Amino acid sequence: ILKVGATPPPPVTLTLSPTREISLEVVSPLAPIQYKASSETYALSRKEIEALPRGNNNELHDVLLTIPSAVYGSLKQVHIRQDHANLQLRIDGVPIPDTVSSTFSDVISPRAWERADIILGGMEAQYGNKAAAVLDITTKSGTKPSFGSVQMMGGSNKTINPSFEYGGTIGEKFRFYILNSHTATNRGIEPPTLGRSVYHGQSERNQTFIRGDYQHDNRNNFTWLFLNSVAKYQIPTSPGGELDPSGQMLPLLQGSRPGFSPVASQAIDEFQKENNQYGHMVWRHDVNANNFFSLSGYMRHTRATFKTDPLNLLAYTADPAEPFSAADQDRNAYSTGVRFDYTYTHSKQHLIKAGFQLDRTQSVNKTRLFTFADDGGGNPTGDLLSLNADNRQIGYRQEFWIQDQWSPNDQWTFNLGLRGDIVQYQRNEGQVSPRIGVSYKYNPSNVFHVFYGRMFTPPNLEALSFAKLNTLGTRAQPEDVTNNSVRAERAHYFEVGSYHALNRYATLQFTGWYKLSNFLSDAGQFGTTPLLNYFAFERGSQRGIDGALKLQLTENLTARGNVAWGQCKGYGLQSGHFLLEAKEIADINSQGGVFCDHMQTLTSSAIVSYRLLERTTFTGQMLFASGLRTSENEDAKTNSSHSPSYTIYNLSIAHVFPLPWEGQKFLLGFDIVNLFDQRYYINQGEGSIGLGVSHAGMPRSFFFRGQWFF
């Protein structure tokens, strides 16, 4: 063990024996300050994830909620810095394309993470497409000697979650890692009802992760990666729904389907299936001591199929005078692409990065919509109609960038970059985006940065709305039939921030940011399907400030927390008219615009972890949310108010039992989520943009977990 104090240590030489590996672990009370970055950076280690309540059984969104400016918006979506999703996932530096369900199913389980480096805003030129935040995950890989574990977690909400992982080597040059996890619960999708009773909410999901690394020689390394996620979700329902309050629907349905008898509202049977696969191969090559590059090729398939229960759903139509329908949806997309990253260390003053990425996406969006004809007076009539549409699109995206990190001296760093983005999908668009960042190290304990950059964010091709469906003359006809193509968002981004090492055991960071957009992109849930549809405002603004504190009070006591304030407003509707009601469109087009659905004014989280006698860990977690936007009543302006705030407290205790066999141990954990059983809605369907449904948070829940390490 080598301890480094105030005095520089003498040189250390590590010598590898011919047949044994040396494991080198660098331990610091806190992560060092990033004094050359022009953005807010945050890091999560494997140990920090395992210390959370539920440990590494947490899902992606649960882990993300521990970083600054992260807002939870239901359906496993996390909105960072007041952007709707707009999160870029990377595995070992390679961007992972979104799924058709917009990250509704986790692409990669936190169980496979070794660490995650997070960049919030202030992106250098090599980061594009999704730019609110970048989550760069370094995954586990094989080691010698090999390692593995078998884990079982279960508890409230009919939850059962077995998992298995194993990593090792084959020969001297090939390493591998395998993970499989299966999850079953009755809260796969947040229900519209408060409390423990969940109606029609069962879900199952299976995830597989396979990684292989081949070290050809000292200059060439190859990595293969394969991800698979298969899931089925029942759509939760509410009891006590009023059957055919208008008296018009049931006679029409029974006239179209003689003998039809509607079920109770909680028995309406809608569900969604998801099927996602992703694979890539990366070649990393060291040309010499100053030149490095990586070349990657990737392929992704993603599919989500939503099946409605048309007759029973339509039987509970509240007001046939408003547009109504029930619909099946089938979204399917294939993406292939290549990415090239080049790094050149010109000198101690200049670190140059350049590269390109080419992407091709083919998407299919099939819709089968059920409704009735319009009698000309706004009333349904005739037999039940079945309307079909089959949209097929091919889109291309090209990205190019060059970046110079210029450090003329030890105090100043200038990050100067330029990137170009071109897309061809429903329309052809492009932008050249300068990125300029400056970092100033006042002293080793205090660093300040400023940033300005242009951002270009095209919508996901596979999530564009089904525009070809002809509903004219039916009760599904929208109140506004305007059909503009969604434009790519173009934004000016400003950021200023600072990092402070208060002492060896505490770091503090502050960041303020402002984003001014043309064609501010957004997405919403329209109807009961969890599949989201994109729309855009003519312009928008987002702003906020956040602060984060990390503490290592003793060797066994750590804490971290953050608080953020933010705002998002949209003005004028650019696209998506046929998805919205006339009142919503009028509110958006009003002089003052509207607050965005995903906006949350105040957000905060905190975690305290204490390790007792090396083997027992206690963890407490707090999550505070001031509430997503809604309106007080149907006459109030859209999103003019917010849902009630809520604060969630989670607790965890975990103990490690050593086993008599070499290198083996057993972990036993007990977790409580929502300790004080607060009843709250994550969002409320009424008063916000779209025909959304409410989503209620998890009540007090108990979980047990056991993990055998071998």
What positions do the PLM features span?
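N-terminal periplasmic accessory domains that precede
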Residues: 10-13, 60, 78, 103-106, ...
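Short, acidic, small-residue-rich periplasmic hinge/interaction motif at the N-terminus
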Residues: 3-53, 84-85, 122, 286
